[in-house]
Structure formats: C-alpha cells, structure tokens
C-alpha cells in the first residue's frame, strides 16, 4: 500500500537505522530528464511522517548541486549516541567523482555542506556500499574495472582490493558481506561476479552464468548466511534472480523466475532474510521468498518502470521505489486500504473546481456525487506470511492444570557448514508450582483422610498452633474422635472433675471448721431462704445429701410427738395433711416461707403439684443462680442459651454439654454460636466457631471462619479446608448424619480449593476434594475439565456427564415439495446444566445457524410427554381446518389428538417446513414445568417449549402440527387488535421471536363473559375439516378483506418458506373472509376434551380503545435517538438483504425497550448500563458495548431484559461487522 510520494526524478537514500525521525534523501538522477527538461541538480531531504494521512512528504531542506548522481547512500559514520541528524551522505557523480555531504548542515541550511570530494574514478560511479562493521569504509565501482576502498578518515588516498579484472569492464554493483567484514563482491553487466578478500588483496572466487546471457543489474548478500548471494539479470531473455552458494559455485542454488521482463534492481531485507524485493521492466514490484521462490507480496504500482528500490533501515515494513515517471513512492508491505487515498483525490478535485462547471458555462453545479462502491473495497492485502520482526521468537501461555506451554525458534547449524543455519521450532510443556507449602499441607490432609489418622493429625496441628484460638479449635476437633466427647469438651472449657472435687472438699472443710451443724428438720427448713437446702444439695452431691438425711432423721427415730391442730400456721398445715389436702398444705408452707417443707410435701402430692410448687419457689427465690437452677430443674436449656450474658458463653456451653439431650444438642450449640457471631465483638465472633464445631455444623463453620479470617491467601483457604474436612469426617463417624449434602458456601470454597490444587498440577487431589453431589454448573464444568485433564476415569468416580450437548447442525436446504410424505418429528431431549433454569417459553436462544434454514415448528403443549421413546414413532397429525383470526378472547382452536398412522400419505398436499435443527421436545428435567393443564388453557400459559440453541421459531404455517401457542397474523386479516407496541409493557406476554420470525399475536389471558345469544359450535363430524374446499370457497378466500390500520411500529412481516416460496398465511374457510371488523372470535369455555365444531360463530365484541403512549423521559430520550441512529447507519451500509431484515426487525422490537422507558419499569442498574452502551456507540467502540451488554444480561433480572436485549446485541454485532 502506498504511504507517501515525492515528485522527483532522483536517486534515493534512507537515513541510518539509528536516526530518528526517518529521513529520505534524494539527489537528481544522472542521464534522466524530468518533464520540464531542466538541467539543474539538487540534493533534498524529506521527513517521513506516517501520522500525516496525506501522500505528501515534508521537505526539510534543499541544496543546489552542480552534480547529478548515479548512486546515493547515507552512511552512519560519526553518528552520535542520541541519534541526532548526522552520518554522511555519499554520492557517486557522473564524472568519476565521489562527494561527501553533511546532512545535518543541509537540514540546518548551511551553504558549506560538502565534507570532501575525490575525482579518482574514471567514468561515472554507479556502485557504492558502506561496510556495516566498519562504517568508515566505503567501496565504490566505476568503469574500467575500477574498485576503490575509501577510508572516510583518510579520504584522499583510496586502496584497491586487488588487481583489476581482465578484460576491463564496467562495475554495475558492489556489496559488502553481511557476516564477514573483509569480504567484498562486485558484478558487471557481462554477468560475472567477483568475490574479493581484502586481507589477501585478491579475488577468491568468480561466479558466472554458463548461458552468458546474464546481464547483472543487482547484487545482494544473504543477511544471515555468509556464503550465499543473489544476482539479478536485466536481460529480457533471461529475467531471473539467481541465488548462489559459493561452496557450490558450479551452478545456482535456486533460480527465481517471477518477472516477465528484465530486472532493474533488487534489495534484500536485513530484518527478514525471507523477504527479497525486486523491480523490473514488467512494471512490477515483487516481494519474494528466495528460499522457496514464492511471491509473498506484489505492490500495487502503476505502469511505469522502477529503476531503484530500497528498504527503510529503521522501519522494516517500509520501502521506497524510484520510477522513470519522475516519482519516488513509499510503500508498506503490511497492507491497508486505498479508499482514503481515492477520497482525498476526489476532495482535491472538488476543492479545485468548486461548484462551477469546469467547462466554462459558469453555471453552479450540484454537490459532487460519488457513486457508492458497495461491492468493491480497495483493500490491499498484506504479506502471505508474517515477517520476521513481528513473529515472536519465543512465547509462553498458561494452560489448565498449572502447565506452562512455551515455544522458541532455535537456529541450529546445518551439516554443510557452520554458517548455514536451520530454524527449529521447539515446544516445551512444564509444570509450574508456586505454592509449595500449600501442596505439602494438602498432601498431609489427604494422607490423614486415607489412613483415618485424625487424632494424630489434630495433635500435630495443636502442637504447631501459633495462637491460643487456633489451638482451641484443633482441640475441639480432636475431641470428636475420642471417647466421652462431652466430658472432654467440658475439660476444654475449664471444668475438670478432679479440680471440681478438690474445690468442693475445700469448701466442706471450711464449713466444718465453723461448727455449723444441722440438727433437725425445722432448722433446715428455716436456715436460709435464699440458699435453700435444695440448691446446696445440688452443689454438694449425693454424698453430702446422705449425711444430711442421717443427721436429720436419726434423732426422731424414738419417742412420742404432739400433733397440733391449733389455729396457727402449723395447726392449719396439720389439718390439711390429715385430710389429704397436700395442695393447701404446700400453699401454707410457701406462705410461711418454709420452702423445704413445701417442696417435700409437693413430692408426696404428685408430679403436677411438684411442678407448680417448683415454679412458685423459683418465682420467690432471687439468688444469683436461681435462673440456672430453674433451667436445670425444668430442663429448659434454651432459656440459658438465649438469655445468658455472652461473656458467660463458656458456662452456657458447659451446661448444654452436661444436660442437653442428643436430639437437641446440635440445635442449642447452633443457637449459641449464632448469638456469638451476631455480636459486635470480634473476639466473641471467632469463639462461635467452637460452638459450630460442637454442633457439627460445617456450613456455619465455613461462614463464620470466612467472616473472621483473611481468605485472600491460599494458605488461609487451606486452614479452612483442613478444619472442614476433619469436622465432616467427625460428624460422619459420631453423629451418623448425612454429610454428602453440601451447602452453597461450602461448595464454593471447595470449588475454589480444587481450582487452586489444579492450578498447582494436583489434578487427582482436586477431584478428590471436589463435591460430588452438587448440581452447580461451575462445579460440574470444573469436574469435567479435571477428568479430561487427567486423561482417564478416576477409580471410584463416575465420569461426569458433559454439561452441554454437542449437536451437528445440518446446513440449510429448501423444504420438501408439497405432497411428499413427511414423517413427524419425535421429541428430543434438551439438556440444561444442573442449577440452571431453561429459557422461558418462547425465548429464542440465538446461535450460529444457517440463515437460509427454515423456522422450527413448535409442538403442541397438549401432546408433551416426559418420557421420550428411543426410536422415532410415527404419529401423524390430521391437518386441522384453517381458522379465522379476530380480537377478543382466546383462540377457539384446539390441537388435534394423534391418530394411528394411516396406510396412505399422512400429509396430503401439505407443505412441510424443515428446520436447521430438530427440536420438537424438551428435557425430562423440565418437562413437567411446561405441560398444558387443559385444552382450554390460554395461549399465554400454553406456549411450546423453547427451541434449542441455533433453532429458529416458526409460528404456524402450512402443514405445521397444531399448536395452541400464539399465531402470526396473516395478510388481509380483519380485526381491530391494537399493535403490540401500543400495549403497556406489563400486558405483553408471549414468546419473543427471532429476528426473522413472524411476530406472535399477543393476547391477554382473560376470560370474558359470553354473550347471551351465543350458539355452541357444531360437533366434529369429520376427521378432516374441509382440507381442500370447493372452488367458490377458494375464490372467496383469495379476496382480501378490508384491512384495519395497525400501528406502524408493529407491522407484521410476511414470512417465507425455504426456497423462496412465499407464505400466504392461514386461509379462512368459506364465509369468513368478508366479515366486518366488529366481529371477532368468541371465547369458548368447556370441559376438557369437549368437541369443537367445524364452523365458528362470530359475535360482536366490545370496541377497542386505542392506547396513547406516554412520552419517553428526557433523561432516557438519548437512548432511543442513539439506537435508532445506529440502526439507520447500519441499514445504509448493509448490502445483504438478510442483514437488512435483521435490522428492520430489531428496530421494531426495540419498541419494547422504549415502552419500558415510558413506563419507567426498568431498574436503575439496567438503565445505567444502557446509557453506557449508548456512550460506547457514540465513540464507535462496539466491542466495549458488547461487553457491557453481557454484563447487563448476566447481572439483571431476565424478565426485564429478555424482550429487547437480544436484538440490541444483534444491532451492536452488525455495527461492529459493518464498521459504521
């Protein structure tokens, strides 16, 4: 592709690679005249600015010269480290002179720009080259076999490489070797090339073509291989490029014959040895691979010959060519588009002439109209293979399982010599392990699980614990695997039996030292109201109780006693006891604060009296431990857990461990843990983990630990998984609970842990820790990837089912001809990943389908089955009679029941619509969700199941199986149904069609009151309801009825059958075509299975009222403006009719979005995302818009966006494709 051009008949030279910016020097060419026949000569320097889109190059300086040039080169001699304009321009003149110029002075505008000049040569100097190893050495060639080596440090006295070759001849080209600094080659028009060794000052080899027709016009050394070079021939009889290897100089190594006429110049890229430029008399510039002879690129040039061609040293993709038409052109081999250049030429022409007639009439002309080039785009393709400088020498990529895949291109020396190198491609796959401690601890956990050595594992963790809390956690976990776990829990809480016995014994010794003795029962009853004997007995134990009983009852074993029946309290109690009235006696004792007597009498009075007495006692007693005693006696442990101060959580947990029954133990521990977790104190929140360990609640332990600990590091996750695995094993062994059920949070943590293990290369361990009985899609996909990465099924693990179904979609083809026998399709299962809901009824799952494939036929919901037969079972449907459309109520049509397969054609004269995919059923998993409840169910609740991905959705059609879903409105149908876009968003139901599907007839599923003059339909008397009809009926059916104007935003496109067959809609039976608009279909309500007549009685319906739409709020009006403008731009750029149909349908279906904006029913998140999409459209960043679209769909409610987001994606995709 052409980048720049300079109108000069001149020789050219690029600035050295170290120089920035890039300059191009031009010197007036000798023996050539421009169009002005000027004899003046000049030396100019131009700057290459690729950021400027114009073709003109900026001229930096011009120096008027008295010389015209045969050769011009720019050497890097005296180039400073900063890359400033320096070096030296070396020019070969007409009269054997070599002139050295200072380019920095030329650009600065100085007059004294000549560094040195020498006229030692005889005749014009046509060959010049700079040694790339010693930049002060310059080789030159002229007539009479003159070759000089110039030292720029001592320019006055050149040296020769050796004796002149005989016979004397002109030196047409000269070149230094690119690998060996003392090797020089020269060539002459006779076809002979001589290789010189400057150390020996003699030629070492001569290369010549045996045909003697090789007129050498170009010479170039291989950039990498020191012994290879190419020679170009300008003879039209032999327009070839010969590649020679000096080790086999008897014949050319390879001959390139891509030019039709003689070659004038060649240039070998220093950046890529596989790119060789050549230009010839056939007006072609070719870029070839000299190793294979293949033409990789042909530059788009004009019909003029090019006599010089050069690569840019700094930018390897840029080259320049000087042609005989007086122009130097700059090209890029990376391709591009020339549309901009053509438009610039048109603009230049238009700006020159203006709006006046260029032929002198003086009349103004209309603006210049450029014909639209719709089919042809001037795209210039790049090279067939990537050049070396953009090919990566090395590369790396991580793959699943922690594997690192690297490649490198290694050059190895060949067997023929050390200089010859061959490129080898190596690919290495290595395992990358970054978390060694994480893997080590994971292995220890696996060994503990496999060996069942949980106690030893927990003890190691206790010994290695660095915090007291960590030590307590592992101690609690260890107790689960020991005997008497509750007693061990109490010891961990600080309640050891031995220590408690010592404390009690010490307390008893203090009591004995004070000589406090209990002498009789009255003293016991009246000793202390607060600290009752019952509480003391509870604390001192059975041994003290027995001693008390002996001390109380032994003194009263003999003698007589008085039974007093006086009027005091004792007398009343005596009378109540003598009459057996225990309840009154207890009440008297409680009244007299004789608590012990009351409780002892209540025991004699029965359990009910004892319970009431205990409650009254606890109500009167107000000691510090009364509530604890109450809970112990009444066995109300929930009261302790719910009401205790959380600072005493250890005491509450100890009480639960001591007294709670096994069936309520876990719930009480959970309750206490929940209280601790909800407390604001972080220390108490962490202690909740101990309660959950006692309860064996793994899910809550995960939640609490995640909240309390930092989980960003892999080792933090390892800490949690260790505790979870050990606790699950403990619960499984001790509590006989089902641990296979995994909660959502635990499944997420286990999945994250398995991902980390897989990333470190532990595939088997990742599979072992991954939950088995969960239906979460991400876990199912991870298990599938792990099994595939392992390469073989794991022992004890069933190979997981692929969480998606592979389908081979047949290419679209025309449907069968009408009248051909078609077997009905059998329902096929569609698999949805576990945990995901199927698409709602009628939603189109867009896929990569053939646009020519016909729409898919829906299956009647009344005939759905949850069991699918393994083989197709033909059950042809009898064709149903066509039915009319109208407004009001549900459709009167009911699907026909399947009948036995007939012996004749099941579809007489009925065309069948084929589909790109055979979806007619649904998965057993979701079949029950879509079964129709009764034949009278409304269309809004009786949609067919969703088609599989890649299938279209066709409503109705000739020969389609009956369906109770909504039907497309055929042309010419009468009625006053309001447009779908005029209805509020909340009233629109029904399936969302594909872009090329007939729109569904939206109905509100309401039962309307039947009119009084309604006539029931005639029962069905024939299995086929007028399939053909009489001629009069057909003539009436073809007459269109008076159409009722609908909203322009809800026009119904006419569908087409495959193969270009038009779809004429569903024809109406006789007598229904010319029906006035006031008539509509009645809603027939009846018992399931009631017969339906073959004629339909129409009754007058209520007149419909047109709904006036609200205006779109001002803050959202930009959305409609932006989306409609984008669709119009796409329509103007689209050339494919199918694409235009997509965009037309998208424009209509975006009305759903505008209605929701009018009603303001969209959530703020969705509206904000839509505004972001609109901003990306304004900046034409459609990729960002598609990313935002995916984010909105994945994070929002599906019911809010299903009506318009799919078509918005279609518009963005088409805009990105069309580049509007």
Curated annotation (Swiss-Prot):
Residues 161-471 are annotated as: Interaction with SEC13. It comes from the Eukaryota. Its main location: cytoplasm. The modification Phosphoserine is found at residues 527, 532, 799, 1163. Component of the coat protein complex II (COPII) which promotes the formation of transport vesicles from the endoplasmic reticulum (ER). The coat has two main functions, the physical deformation of the endoplasmic reticulum membrane into vesicles and the selection of cargo molecules. COPII is composed of at least 5 proteins: the SEC23/24 complex, the SEC13/31 complex and SAR1. SEC13 and SEC31 make a 2:2 tetramer that forms the edge element of the COPII outer coat. The tetramer self-assembles in multiple copies to form the complete polyhedral cage. Interacts (via WD 8) with SEC13. Interacts with PDCD6; interaction takes place in response to cytosolic calcium increase and leads to bridge together the BCR(KLHL12) complex and SEC31A, leading to monoubiquitination. Interacts with KLHL12. This is Protein transport protein Sec31A. It comes from Homo sapiens. The gene is SEC31A.
